[in-house]
Amino acid sequence: MTSFILKRLGFAVVTLVAVLSLVFFIVRILPGDPAMVILGDQANAASIAALRTKLGLDRPMLVQYFVFLSGAVRGDWGVSMVSGRPVIAEVLSVLPNTIELTLVSLVLGVIIGVPAGVWAAVNRNRIPDIVTRVVSLLGLSAPAFVSGIVLLLVFAIALQWFPVISGGQDQSLGGRLRDLALPAVNLALIMAAYVTRVTRSAMLEVLGQDYVRTARAKGIPAGIVIWRHAMRNCLIPVITVIGLYLGILIGNSVLTEIVFNRPGLGKLIVGALTQRDYTMLQGMIVIYTLIVVLVNLITDLTYGLVDPRVQYR
């Protein structure tokens, strides 16, 4: 186990360095000059040159790269080119909102998707199965921003059950839940569609095993056979898809935050892109990469808890 964790941590470090390097050079080749964006089109050449010197943009590309890399290793991600605040402070101020939305959506998606997948598998090729497959296909086909707009039009504008703009002044528990409801449901439905299809496929495979048929032949109630015996053996593919999709879920949460005007990484990313805030973009992508790497490691370690037959090498 220890050697496995150390090996995965080594891979994580290599992945982070590769992502940091890729992000640095991609951000630098984006069109637009941060100094001109900050000062405006009316700024003179001397002011632009002075700001470029202050931001370190007049240095050679490789010098900027090694300064950025050494700072990232020390946990110093620099300061925002626009606000002048430390990047880590800017990111951490909105990160809890994105994590809150992601975790609530994840829990809702699993609560909906796992029972729906089991229900479809038990009723294979019957009406419940057909309905579940059609609904999950719709969930997979609709992009997060499209389904988000539909939810806004129906439940916020037409029915007026929820606020159009999230993150209002009402910070009570009820107000926060109302703000969170539509964005969380939007992401949870997409998550549930993935989980449903994987759970159905895994459960169908397990239900065809000899030990399941033997348990049924002994007269064990169907509910016990499915939830106590079959479910445990189909959890690994379900856990895998949850771990893999969590990274996608964070990306979709960014789009959802933009649609619902919810404070979080989404609005920060849009601002950084439009203002060519290199350091802010780099910091947010580093956070995203760290979360994905950590989730993948936790997913791998969970396999051994679910199935003792899994060996770590």
Please report, for each region that a protein language model flagged, where it lies by residue.
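Membrane-water interface segments at the C-terminal ends of transmembrane alpha-helices
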Residues: L22-I29, R59, S70, V134-I165, ...
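Short, hydrophobic secondary-structure boundary micro-motifs
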Residues: M36-L39, V63, G78-M81, S147-G148, ...
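Alpha-helical transmembrane segments of integral membrane proteins
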Residues: T2-S3, V13, A89-I130, A144, ...
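An internal, D/E-rich "acidic patch" concept
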Residues: D58-V114
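Hydrophobic alpha-helical transmembrane segments of membrane transport/permease proteins
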Residues: T15-F66, L159-D179
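Residue-level marker of structural boundaries
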Residues: A43-N44, G56-L57, R74, G78, ...
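Membrane-interfacial helix-loop-helix junctions in multi-pass membrane proteins
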Residues: T53-L62, R74-V87, G168-L180, L187, ...
